[in-house]
């Protein structure tokens, strides 16, 4: 029995109690929101990860870290170093490998990860078909489904399943005046398969069987947005919205079968449209968790897309997004290095917390208040220990040597906090004030 079925039957499980303790909300609210599909536990029940990762309504915003080889760069040691970064900064991890021995790479990443691991199974079967049959779109429906099952058996906790795109939507998008017709790699693979085989989406045709597989492992279906906007000028056009409407129907059927499901979102969205993008998705899908790639509010930010997208991510988090998929400085330019993965993950950790301060209020702001208290006291040791990256903070604090006064090297003897503390002492010792 899956966690949704348990919740619907009124059962309070150890996992629900753990979520309640982790997030600081009553266990009955956890159970109720799981029963409604508004909280998901990202896991593969047969191969639990070392970290408990719930996402959903009134929970802290989580961060996903993408890693993986490419056809141009296959360096497993580098990818395993990225896993270590993800373990430190992230909540979930996706293996998006497209080069090398994909089965071996996936299994090594799962073994090294403390986090629930996700994949995009169509990548593997498309690449295998391309190598064996001289065409990526030559795979059969059974081969695709067998790949999904193989990933589940390996312990994958969530998968991007591009089931929302229809053949009609794909053809019309490719013929349209969109700036970029399709930017989703997996979405383009499914679109190519439908056109090559003159057939409907293989996930949609076999949807009941897909649900059965995920139900067996109580893993999470992440409904991919194949037609997400890859340019801000394409945001919220008929193709993005058309796919979202199809996705909403699939969400309903998944929840009816007791299958955990979340929805993926854009992408590239102007700043003023981000909040209502979240509200629209939540309205159409009944409030299931939303997993968003930023979004990027501009298209000109590379090689600083981790910064540009963190701006959008903070707004989306504040508006109700549950899981943020990070971007790195290499986005739109190439495969990221280990350092770039870390830079992206830290930017998104900051964005997630900024959103939580709005979304969760005082509960999230307690951390900030504590840091500010120590900052006001010039208690550098305690303040630095509470910061998001204490090691880096200490390096900056001492980069010109240990300050000669209690203040830092920016203000030195003219530090307002130092002067304020001195004035407080004078006020306290004076009988005339």
Swiss-Prot record:
GO terms of molecular function: 4 iron, 4 sulfur cluster binding; carbon-carbon lyase activity; zinc ion binding
Binding note for cofactor: Binds 1 [4Fe-4S] cluster per subunit. The cluster is coordinated with 3 cysteines and an exchangeable S-adenosyl-L-methionine.
Pathway entry: Cofactor biosynthesis; thiamine diphosphate biosynthesis
Residues binding substrate, per UniProt: 66, 94, 123, 162, 184-186, 225-228, 264, 291
Keywords: 4Fe-4S, Iron, Iron-sulfur, Lyase, Metal-binding, S-adenosyl-L-methionine, Thiamine biosynthesis, Zinc
Keyword Transcription regulation applies: no
UniProt-listed Enzyme Commission number(s): 4.1.99.17
Binding site for [4Fe-4S] cluster: 408, 411, 415
Cofactor: [4Fe-4S] cluster
Entry binding sites for Zn(2+): 268, 332
GO terms, biological process: thiamine biosynthetic process; thiamine diphosphate biosynthetic process
Coiled-coil regions listed in the entry: none
Catalytic activity annotation: 5-amino-1-(5-phospho-beta-D-ribosyl)imidazole + S-adenosyl-L-methionine = 4-amino-2-methyl-5-(phosphooxymethyl)pyrimidine + CO + 5'-deoxyadenosine + formate + L-methionine + 3 H(+)
Task performed by this protein: Catalyzes the synthesis of the hydroxymethylpyrimidine phosphate (HMP-P) moiety of thiamine from aminoimidazole ribotide (AIR) in a radical S-adenosyl-L-methionine (SAM)-dependent reaction.
Entry-linked PANTHER family: PHOSPHOMETHYLPYRIMIDINE SYNTHASE, CHLOROPLASTIC, THIAMINE BIOSYNTHESIS PROTEIN THIC
Family membership noted in the UniProt record: Belongs to the ThiC family.
Protein name: Phosphomethylpyrimidine synthase
Source species of the chain: Saccharolobus islandicus (strain M.14.25 / Kamchatka #1) (Sulfolobus islandicus)
Gene: thiC
């Amino acid at each position: 029995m899956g966690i949704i079925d348990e919740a619907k039957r009124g059962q309070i499980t150890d996992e629900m109690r753990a979520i309640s303790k982790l997030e600081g909300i009553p266990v009955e609210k956890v159970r109720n929101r799981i029963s409604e599909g508004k909280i998901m536990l990202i896991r593969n029940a047969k191969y639990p990860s070392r970290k408990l990762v719930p996402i959903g309504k009134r929970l802290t915003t989580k961060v996903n870290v993408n890693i993986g080889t490419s056809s141009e760069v296959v360096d497993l040691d580098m990818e395993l170093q990225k896993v270590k970064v993800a373990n430190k900064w992230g909540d979930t991890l996706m293996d998006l490998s497209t080069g090398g021995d994909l089965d071996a790479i996936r299994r090594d990443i799962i073994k090294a990860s403390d986090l629930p691991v996700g994949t995009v199974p169509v990548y593997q079967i498309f690449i295998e078909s391309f190598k064996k049959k001289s065409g990526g779109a030559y795979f059969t429906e059974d081969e695709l489904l067998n790949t999904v099952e193989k990933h589940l058996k390996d312990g994958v906790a969530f998968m991007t399943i591009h089931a929302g795109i229809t053949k009609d939507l794909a053809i019309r998008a490719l013929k349209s005046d969109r700036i970029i017709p399709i930017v989703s790699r997996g979405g383009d693979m499914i679109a190519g398969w439908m056109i090559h085989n003159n057939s409907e989406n293989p996930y949609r045709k076999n949807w009941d069987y897909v649900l059965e597989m995920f139900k067996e492992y109580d893993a999470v279906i992440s409904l991919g947005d194949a037609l997400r906007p890859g340019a801000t000028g394409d945001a919220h056009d008929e193709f993005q919205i058309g796919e979202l409407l199809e996705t909403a129907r699939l969400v309903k059927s998944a929840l009816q079968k007791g299958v955990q499901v979340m929805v993926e979102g854009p992408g590239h969205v102007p700043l003023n449209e981000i909040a209502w993008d979240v509200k629209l998705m939540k309205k159409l899908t009944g409030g299931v968790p939303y997993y968003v790639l930023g979004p990027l509010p501009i298209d000109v930010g590379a090689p600083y897309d981790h910064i540009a997208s963190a701006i959008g991510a903070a707004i989306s988090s504040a508006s109700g997004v549950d899981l943020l998929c990070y971007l790195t400085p290499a986005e739109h330019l190439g495969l990221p290095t280990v350092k770039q993965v870390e830079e992206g993950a830290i930017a998104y950790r900051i964005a997630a917390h900024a959103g939580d301060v709005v979304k969760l209020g005082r509960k999230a702001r307690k951390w900030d208040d504590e840091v500010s208290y120590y900052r006001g006291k010039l208690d550098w040791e305690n303040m630095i220990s509470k910061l998001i990256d204490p090691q880096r903070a200490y390096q900056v604090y001492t980069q010109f040597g240990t300050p000669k006064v209690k203040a830092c090297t920016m203000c030195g003897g003219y530090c307002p906090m130092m002067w304020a503390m001195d004035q407080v002492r004078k006020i306290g010792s004076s009988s005339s004030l």
